[in-house]
Amino acid sequence: MERAAKKEAVDALKGTFQSTGVAIVAHYSGLTVAQMQTLRTQMKQAGASVKVSKNRLAKIALEGTDVASIGSLLKGPTVIATSNDPVAAPKIAVEFAKTNEQFVILGGAMGTTVLNPDAVKALASLPSLDELRAKIIGLLVAPATKIAQLTNAPAAKVARVVQAYASKGEAA
């Protein structure tokens, strides 16, 4: 790899690391090309990405970023999964590791917080940001719906009483 190509690779990685919410590092030795392609596809669908690069270049790119702490995990054949959603990359990585023994999660970082493999698994068990937003909106909308039902209930009762008198008057 020429010096200019290395500089370009480092700059691209640095941009990725600076804009990511979470980074997960895993060993991928022994995975087939098809398995790696499956991982890339799943990550892309979840809004995450997977990068395989030379460890030395990745360590240089990590310098000065929030996730610089993962540099110590870069030993051997490693893959780095990143996403803006703090749950997307860990969730896909943990699910993929369950079905592929060769894929071993080493750890990661969420901002400046270092994550060990157990913390990555715990993070993966959390609902995504979109799911949390939906729950919050549901909680906010529920009281408004109940208030609307309560304010409409007296009017409905009055209408039923009037209807009952009208029916009684017709019957007489």
Curated annotation (Swiss-Prot):
Signal peptide: none annotated. Transmembrane segments: none annotated. One of its GO terms (biological process) is translation. Keywords: Ribonucleoprotein, Ribosomal protein, RNA-binding, rRNA-binding. InterPro entries: Ribosomal_uL10 (IPR001790), Ribosomal_uL10-like_sf (IPR043141), Ribosomal_uL10_bac (IPR022973), Ribosomal_uL10_bac_type (IPR047865), Ribosomal_uL10_CS_bac (IPR002363). Belongs to the universal ribosomal protein uL10 family. Forms part of the ribosomal stalk, playing a central role in the interaction of the ribosome with GTP-bound translation factors. NCBIfam families: PRK00099.1-1. This is Large ribosomal subunit protein uL10.
